[in-house]
A protein has these predicted regions:
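Intrinsically disordered, low-complexity terminal regions
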Residues: 1-249
Length: 249
């Protein structure tokens, strides 16, 4: 693990100081490279499918990512299409064009993408932060839920409070919120029959345009956050290449 930490340090220094540098790998666009560093796992390429359990953290960057196994530590995944099943033993960080979550998460979950879907099989023990263009939450959060997007659809369960910033909020009949719902948007939300919001609804009127092009809106926030995640994953990608090229490091 010491070799990998050294490689990460060198990679981070390189990425921080050489902004114009890029690395390419010739071959099939679906080809992937995976490496195990102690208990930690790194996967990069056109397509990464994680089906074996990981005893530590997992760092994945690919055009298509599919996870159907247990990750005992943190999971960091960035790609065009990201599908997460199985379980995460600590925190989850995911970013992509389309992100689908159907997993057990022991820690917190932070997800950003163009289309973010949290399925009904999802149980998150900690807090949840969702940012994107279109967000659907049908899961179960034992903590706090924060969602920012052009459109947000809630039809899941939140044990704590929920805060939503969106141009359009749809509350489904299966919605269960143990605390209060704070909504920032152009019009007051409609709470359908069957939905339960124990702490009531607190509405703050906001202009719809804020959610599309304002610097503080979810689109801008998504771009910034995805950029940060990609840089972080890029450090581990570069570290992987360091150890492949210089195995004696």
């Amino acid at each position: 693990m010491t070799r990998f930490i050294s490689a990460v340090a060198l990679a981070a220094l390189g990425l921080a100081t050489i902004s114009g540098c890029s690395i390419s790998v010739d071959g099939d666009e679906k080809e992937s490279v995976t490496r195990q560093f102690g208990n930690d796992y790194v996967g990069i390429g056109g397509m990464v499918n994680l089906t074996d359990p990981v005893a530590g953290d997992a760092f994945l960057a690919a055009g298509q990512i599919s996870i159907a196994s247990e990750v005992q530590g943190d999971l960091v995944a960035a790609g065009g299409e990201v599908s997460i099943g199985g379980s995460v033993g600590d925190d989850l960080y995911a970013a992509g064009g389309d992100v689908q979550l159907d997993a057990m998460v022991t820690g917190n979950a932070r997800i950003a993408g163009g289309d973010v879907q949290v399925g009904p099989a999802t149980v998150i023990a900690g807090a949840v932060s969702l940012t994107g263009g279109r967000i659907t939450f049908d899961g179960n959060s034992h903590g706090y839920l924060q969602a920012s997007g052009a459109s947000v659809n809630l039809n899941g369960q939140v044990h704590g409070d929920a805060e939503v910033r969106a141009e359009d909020l749809v509350i489904g009949p299966e919605t269960r919120i143990g605390g209060r719902l704070v909504y920032h948007g152009p019009t007051a939300p409609v709470v359908p029959e069957g939905a339960v919001i124990a702490g009531g609804v607190e509405f703050h009127e906001s202009e719809a345009s804020r959610f599309l092009d304002n610097e503080g809106g979810p689109v801008a926030e998504t771009v910034r956050w995805v950029g940060a995640v990609l840089w972080f994953v890029g450090v581990f990608v570069a570290a992987t290449l360091f150890l492949m090229i210089f195995p004696g490091l």
